[in-house]
Amino acid sequence: QAIGCKYTFPNEKIKFTGTLGHIGTTSFYPSKNLGCYGDGGAIFTNDNDLAHRIRMIVNHGEKIKYHHEIVGCNSRLDSIQAEILNVKLKYLDEYNSTRKIMANNYNLAFEDVGEIQIPTVISSSEHVYHQYTLRVLNGKRDQLKTYLNDLGIPSMIYYPIPIHKQKPYSNNQILENTDILSDEVISLPIHTELENSNQDYIIDNFIKYFK
């Protein structure tokens, strides 16, 4: 979700997200900053042996056609999706810049609104705003979501059920901060086709809720 984002180390070395360790992943789901028109994704690695193994896994475990060395699956990106991404990749920086401008519009408009916490970015990093997510305090999040929906303003909660409460991972862990965030976060519309007039409508009505 942070493709195109950069991190600056204390020695001023700059690296992109997905390249900070030996392996990184990204999704090309259509709503992502760099999305195809179907399902897709990519794995980044600086380890040639690992890259070789990954290529086999995503191609039925094949090293040579019809010779299966390991258990694999069919996770190849089809040529149509690849071509769409090849074109859109040229515009990734532009897409991310547009999202940053929209996020800044929200931040400036909401900086004096009580009972919310807008996203913050540390000086050594940046945000490409796949989502514009803020916190709504004092138990007002769900009522705000209903209010926005009644005005035709979409909003989303990422995510209403945290991982530690999902059945496959539930082991009665108590993660207090995770639960608090899950009850408070809400994401407002942000994408490259959002017109200024529509964002103004969202901002005006969002602020009205807290007056």
Locations of regions flagged by a protein language model:
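Short acidic donor-binding loop at the edge of a beta-strand
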Residues: I23, G40, R53
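Glycine-rich phosphate-binding loop of ATP-grasp-fold ATP-dependent ligases
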Residues: N33, Y37-A42
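Active-site pre-lysine segment of PLP-dependent enzymes
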Residues: Q1-S31
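Short acidic/polar capping segments at secondary-structure boundaries
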Residues: P30-K32, N48-D49
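Acidic, glycine-centered active-site loop in nucleotide-sugar glycosyltransferases
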Residues: L20, D39, Y132
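Hydrophobic transmembrane-helix microenvironments that flank and shape a buried ionizable site
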Residues: T19, C36, S75-R76
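PLP-dependent aminotransferase class I/II
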Residues: A2, K6-E12, N46-K211
